[in-house]
């Protein structure tokens, strides 16, 4: 083998790929149909026989849901595009500044930039060790596992695979809990009212997933318990974003918001600890729909708190988590 076609790199670089759920390319029905078609075709997300489900998805769900979802996205779309994509990009850029000796990039499980395209880019740049970092504090097969599935689908296609690791779920990691605590307390202090309670709303899942062994529900409860022990405010846990006819985790966030005013909780703050960046579920489902539901039920004051996003505290937390994930790869002092 000549020196010119020797595949060995001069130095082996380390890459980190931050991954979040995904977003459409534009807030219109065509883009939403494409995005939702990819998302809802993932059998980690919809655990039904593919042939049966695709008939329902393509014939019934997408024609109706895509235009409705497009209208929801239009309410939160910014000059930078999708908030989730813009924030995740900033998280990667911020982490890169904090960790200049590694290469940091970001990808989306559904939509763009894809996991495969960013893995290809990292490998092409010389990264032979890559940390896959799904930005989901709580593990679920429908979120964390499908990110790993997609990464390994790409690796199956290449001859010289890099060493790939995945960031562990961090649902009770001290850095995560302390960062959430500060984020919540700082925002509550800045409100012009005093909340009677804090609602912690997580993305919901079908009860069946828990029965099949998915730890997500219990990890959400563990996060709430860890936070509650540190906060000087009553904490309530609920689950949002129900979809389909299956039985989902309870209590449901929308029903909880309807019921709280009748329980003398009329001043409410809502945090969403399972979301690492603000997105449709936080900005539209909670901040807009949730607020309307709560006030119409007799609530007086409502605040949807920002996610950790790309704040300095969030970036410091990510640096801690990534450093632990890279244990044994980084040289002392890097």
UniProtKB/Swiss-Prot annotation:
It holds the Pfam family Ferrochelatase. One of its GO terms (molecular function) is ferrochelatase activity. SUPFAM superfamilies: Chelatase. Keywords: Cytoplasm, Heme biosynthesis, Iron, Lyase, Metal-binding, Porphyrin biosynthesis. Belongs to the ferrochelatase family. HAMAP family: Ferrochelatase. Catalyzes the ferrous insertion into protoporphyrin IX. This is Ferrochelatase.
């Amino acid at each position: 083998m000549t020196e010119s076609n020797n595949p060995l790199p001069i130095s082996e670089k380390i890459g980190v790929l931050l991954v979040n759920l995904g977003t459409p390319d534009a807030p219109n029905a065509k883009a939403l149909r494409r995005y939702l078609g990819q998302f809802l075709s993932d059998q980690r997300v919809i655990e039904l026989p593919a042939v049966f489900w695709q008939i329902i998805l393509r014939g019934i769900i997408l024609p109706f849901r895509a235009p409705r979802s497009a209208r929801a996205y239009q309410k939160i779309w910014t000059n930078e595009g999708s908030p989730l994509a813009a924030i995740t990009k900033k998280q990667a850029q911020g982490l890169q500044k904090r960790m200049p000796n590694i290469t940091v990039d970001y990808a989306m499980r559904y939509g763009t930039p894809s996991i495969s395209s960013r893995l290809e880019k990292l490998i092409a740049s010389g990264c032979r060790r890559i940390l896959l970092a799904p930005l989901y504090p709580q593990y679920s097969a429908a979120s964390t596992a499908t990110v790993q599935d997609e990464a390994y689908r790409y690796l199956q296609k290449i001859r010289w695979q890099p060493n790939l690791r995945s960031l562990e779920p961090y649902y009770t990691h001290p850095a995560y809990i302390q960062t959430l605590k500060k984020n919540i307390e700082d925002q509550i202090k800045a409100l012009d009212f005093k909340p009677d309670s804090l609602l912690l709303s997580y993305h919901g899942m079908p009860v069946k997933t828990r029965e099949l062994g998915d730890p997500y529900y219990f990890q959400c409860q563990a996060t709430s318990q860890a936070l509650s022990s540190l906060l000087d405010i009553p904490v309530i846990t609920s689950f949002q974003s129900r979809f389909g006819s299956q039985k989902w985790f309870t209590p449901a966030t929308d029903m909880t918001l309807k019921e709280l005013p009748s329980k003398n909780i009329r001043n409410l703050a809502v945090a969403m600890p399972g979301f690492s960046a603000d997105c449709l579920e936080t900005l539209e489902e909670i901040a807009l729909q949730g607020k309307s539901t709560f006030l119409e039920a007799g609530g007086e004051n409502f605040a949807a708190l920002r996610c950790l996003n790309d704040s300095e505290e969030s970036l410091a937390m990510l640096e801690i988590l990534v450093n632990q994930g890279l244990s044994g790869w980084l040289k002392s002092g890097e």
